[in-house]
Amino acid sequence: MTKLHFDTAEPVKITLPNGLTYEQPTGLFINNKFMKAQDGKTYPVEDPSTENTVCEVSSATTEDVEYAIECADRAFHDTEWATQDPRERGRLLSKLADELESQIDLVSSIEALDNGKTLALARGDVTIAINCLRDAAAYADKVNGRTINTGDGYMNFTTLEPIGVCGQIIPWNFPIMMLAWKIAPALAMGNVCILKPAAVTPLNALYFASLCKKVGIPAGVVNIVPGPGRTVGAALTNDPRIRKLAFTGSTEVGKSVAVDSSESNLKKITLELGGKSAHLVFDDANIKKTLPNLVNGIFKNAGQICSSGSRIYVQEGIYDELLAAFKAYLETEIKVGNPFDKANFQGAITNRQQFDTIMNYIDIGKKEGAKILTGGEKVGDKGYFIRPTVFYDVNEDMRIVKEEIFGPVVTVAKFKTLEEGVEMANSSEFGLGSGIETESLSTGLKVAKMLKAGTVWINTYNDFDSRVPFGGVKQSGYGREMGEEVYHAYTEVKAVRIKL
């Protein structure tokens, strides 16, 4: 093993805006220890609702990541983790789910502080994370191979075997939920993990690591290494000891991840990338029921969801009526502000860079000639808050229609026929999510079959369940998170053929 010397990183006591206090780990979590980075460097973590520094956490170096990979590799090859009765892994995952659930108030509050989303939304994210762990616990001993009858004097069967060391890179929009999406199935199938949280939202990943140790996850099985993508991410994608890599983030970075993973050792990879999803509203839609779905589709999590329904297409028969109702609903029902205030639907944008990007796109939309129905401005003097923004009378050549904004900004256009609406929806190079609003089940199912997207929501939107697979087509990536499908992504198939 590499001869490196690490100092213990001490936790810091944090008092959250709702009065809860806790000990926040600040070090790299490697081999069940919280350590300072090899070079001792740290970086500040910001509360996006106030722009104040919460604490400093260690920033991993390439040497730190290599050490984490060595520890994970040892845990996989030199311990019984991968070969033990899978029910034992299920038992530990169940304990981890119980521990997370027992601390749901605290973990939700950490998420709201670190990410800027509302406390209610954060609690929903933690609930999904808990469900992912429970699903993984149940699946641990139930994802198996099969026998194959060839009728020729042979016995044939397959086994599903763990891949090995898995690199996992998650974004800042759903820190705890994305962590569970990736770690839970990997562990259930007998793999070991090195997870890189987004640099701007590392707090819950590090706190989760402390829970892993508490419930008895063996050393080296889970490692958390915060730091910049150019250092930590590059080390994971380029190291040949990483056999599987799961990445959620932008399409641009995802393409680089695919190239590096291929050139290093043809890693098995899952990519969940960007989106510019369409939300179709047909003439027969119930407008009262549709409005909350449109809001959840684009303004949930301040629009920072890769599957956000950021292009709304409304059939011409109800276009004017829906625009008026949408404007009234947003201006009277949707409040923006302090994530810990229960009255607010939308919290802060997670970081300054993304805030500036969104405001720039709003300026671009104005210059392109799109009309603003409502919103378009910053909220308050402190924190990264943007009012929900709706552009209408847009055309398909506008940048605000074609490019992912990743914020509370939506475009609205009209269509005449079902076929025209589907054509407009499918015109994007992305294909992550899509939505349909209609009172006709036959219309919904017909259009769902025609849409080029990994997920189609009918009369709902951005409505996730850990038992349902999620992923994209086209430039939104490949592979699936959640559902039974994700467990197969963390195994290799071995065929055995015996001559009788």
Curated annotation (Swiss-Prot):
Regulation: The activity is stimulated two- to fourfold by divalent cations but is unaffected by K(+) ions.
Gene Ontology molecular function: any one: aldehyde dehydrogenase (NAD+) activity
Compartmental location: Cytoplasm
Binding site for NAD(+): G249, S250, T251, E252, V253, G254
Cross-link (Glycyl lysine isopeptide (Lys-Gly) (interchain with G-Cter in ubiquitin)): K3, K142, K196
Marked site positions, Transition state stabilizer: N173
Pfam family, one: Aldedh
EC top class named in words: oxidoreductase
Translocase found in the keyword field: no
GO BP: any one term: response to salt stress
GO CC, one annotated term: mitochondrion
Miscellaneous remark of the record: Present with 135000 molecules/cell in log phase SD medium.
Function per UniProt: Cytosolic aldehyde dehydrogenase which utilizes NADP(+) as the preferred coenzyme. Performs the conversion of acetaldehyde to acetate.
UniProt similarity note: Belongs to the aldehyde dehydrogenase family.
Annotated PANTHER family: ALDEHYDE DEHYDROGENASE-RELATED
Protein name: Magnesium-activated aldehyde dehydrogenase, cytosolic
Lineage of the species this protein comes from: Eukaryota, Fungi, Dikarya, Ascomycota, Saccharomycotina
